[in-house]
């Protein structure tokens, strides 16, 4: 079987974009698959993804990264995943897995009472508040899924 880069299929040099423009990136651990995801995010979302990743890495220097279900996940060893994000057509959805414990609460509710969302549209977001949520979330028990 030929070696392939994460998120690339067949002879195509471009990653496959799924529904809403979310990049299809193979499951993987570490920074490399996350960087592949960020590079494949379309248009303005790519710049946003790199900003989110940078804020997370600066705020949580020992952050653990992975790609699962075509989304980058961020966590702390021994505490689980605290955040992920996903591209949609008009925005990027950030999920805080223990977001109901953050102060102030991220604005979006989820079916799971613990989870809170932040939908980021083109044009910017409050980076200071995002960094504060990341810092808080990284200290809380996270999701211990795969």
Q: Which residues does each PLM region occupy?
A:
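Charge-dense, helix-prone N-terminal extensions
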Residues: 2-146
